[in-house]
Regions:
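Cross-family detector of peptidyl-prolyl cis-trans isomerase
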Residues: 3-209
């Protein structure tokens, strides 16, 4: 693999990414569990417990499965409109990209003081076919994911939780389906994929129309 813009090979950048994820986990005292343990405890995670999905490299902590909790339903095959609010945080310092560990890169959650950011959630159409999940953003407003990252493709890492959550329609910030994720570059945004860096997310999932 040829060297990237910063003079490192892709393999070296992947090693740096893995080191950054490991350091983030240690600094936040996360407990990492296997998929087997996750299934053995009925796809529930404890407060500071993250399950590692080996195939994707995504780490997930479920904060709330949805407004009806375990009595809700996972999404069935077909198309669904999903509304998400999120915060995207750098897990790795990258001088050439002008961000450091812990920097907020993009968000539309919480009191930001920017009405354009706060007013609209991310809207995307989720398609489930057998075990395949794909999604496309439906809007490209200023400061939206599609606008900032130049693609309507929803990061694959965002879709991993939807196999386990039971989202509904709610205006309650306490009952909305919500997760925390650590997403490696291959499951992240187009920019993360291009420059090989991981991100931490907190994301909510609400059903649209």
């Amino acid at each position: 693999m040829q060297s990237c813009d910063n003079g490192k090979t892709y393999a070296e950048m992947k090693e740096d990414e893995a080191d950054a994820i490991h350091a983030w986990i240690l600094s936040h005292n996360y407990q990492i569990i296997s998929e087997r343990d996750f299934y053995n405890q009925d796809t529930v995670t404890n407060e500071n417990q993250f399950v590692l999905f080996e195939e994707s490299g995504v780490y997930m902590n479920i904060m709330c499965k949805g407004p009806n909790g375990e009595n809700g339903e996972v999404l069935k095959e077909g198309s669904h409109e999903i509304l998400s609010r999120f915060v995207e945080v750098a897990v790795q310092s990258r001088d050439e990209l002008e961000f450091s560990v812990g920097d907020t890169l993009l968000w539309n959650m919480g009191n930001t003081g920017n009405s354009t950011l706060e007013l609209f959630p991310e809207e995307y159409k989720l398609t489930i076919s057998s075990s395949s999940y794909s999604a496309a953003f439906q809007t490209s407003r200023e400061y939206s994911m599609a606008s900032i990252y130049g693609t309507t493709s929803v990061p694959s890492g965002w879709l991993v939780p939807l196999k386990y959550l039971k989202p509904g329609r709610t205006t309650s910030s306490e009952k909305v389906a919500r997760v925390r994720l650590i997403v490696p570059h291959g499951q992240g945004t187009s920019k993360a994929s291009q420059y090989v860096y991981p991100c931490y997310y907190e994301i909510t999932y609400n059903l649209g129309k």
